[in-house]
């Protein structure tokens, strides 16, 4: 049984590098994974992994600098049934 629907799709979005963007990162990821028809368990694991990576960028790379105008870009692509 396939975990991912057979379709090619790519989306990316830029977010400000601050902790208030993390909810938007999760929402964006969930939306893309829903379009790809990924099962709920896998979707939530992927959202968690991407959100943790984004949180590490905010926490470690920018030291929780709320004044940062820097952007982080999340891109999710599926080609030939591969994320």
Locate each region found by the language model.
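A generic structural signal for solvent-exposed, polar alpha-helical segments
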Residues: 21, 34, 66-68
